[in-house]
Structure formats: C-alpha cells, structure tokens
C-alpha cells in the first residue's frame, strides 16, 4: 500500500498550479490542429507494440513514460472522443469526448504491457472521476484504451486486483475501453518537460513527480 501512497504524495505539490491553466498561457488563434508529427513515428513496427493511456495532464504523464527503458516513443494527444483532429482549445471546452492521452510505442522484449500498467496505476489517482489534482474535467479522466483482447484482460485483471487489495479507500474509476482513435496534440505539447524544464509548472509539479517516480521505479529507468 505504501508503494502507491509514495507516488501520490506528490499531488499536493500542484495545488497552486494546474495543467488546465495552459489553455490561457499557450492559447493560439489557430482553430485547426496542424501538428507536423509524422504518423509513422507513433505506429509500431514488427518489433514494437503500442499502449494508449489517459491519466491526467499529458505534460506530466509524457515525462514519466519517456523515462522507461524499452519505451521508444511517447506522443501526447487526444483519444476516446468523437471529434476528428481536435485542437487543444476544443478539448478544453469539454464537448469533444476526448481525453488527454499518450500513445506509447514500446519494445515488448524489454518492457511488458503489465509493467506499463503498473507505472500507469501507480503514478496517478485512479479513484477521482474526471479529475487529477487541480485539473478537473472529462479530458483528465483515467482510461486504459486497449488495442487487443490481451491488453483488455490484463487491464481488467490488474484493476480488479487493486480494488480487492484495498490499496485505495475509494473505488477505482479507471475506464477500460477499446481503442478507437488517437490524434497527436499540437507540436508545442510534445516533449514539453524536456523543452520547458525551467517553467514553473515543470519545476513545481512535474519535477517532484519525476523524482518520486525515479526512486520507486529505478530498476526500469533508461540508462543515462
């Protein structure tokens, strides 16, 4: 149980900052998502697989999964909604159905889907509906978007085990849904922590979370 609480201990650090504030700080007048990401960069090849998770602000979650050995590409974007190629502003209006999500390409010979699930559940609060800390809205909901029956079964089994374990005082509300779509977010959202590490949100929210993550998952980190 302490293993989970160690990571969740960083949540209060974000009380003065919310990822949602970026809608004002980075708002653009462009009403179309003209990201230049090459689709092949987020498409697995014969030696890789893909996982799609939503667990809060993708600025934070991207920085976590980029650290994992065996993860070859992490793309921030939008998934689970009904509006094609949405902009960030549209998603923030809460009527596209999309969640902020990550498309994670990984090498199953190095890191398993089970291990990615472990990181997913232990680096956010899966008991808060449509909310992570100060970030509130359906775009911050907790979801595993499964790509095949094996991923579905593993996610459901892990969720059931967590609920049974009593690791959380409240029920887990993470949804487990079939993958339907993923639209890469605008370029300024990609590699956000790496490119903006000195920004206040990175210093006071993302960095503390990464430090906690690095201590707990030190055996899964990429070699420097």
Each model region followed by its residue ranges:
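Flexible coil/turn and secondary-structure edge motifs
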Residues: 16-224
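Bacterial N-terminal signal peptides
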Residues: 6-15
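Positively charged n-region of N-terminal signal peptides that target proteins for export
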Residues: 1-4
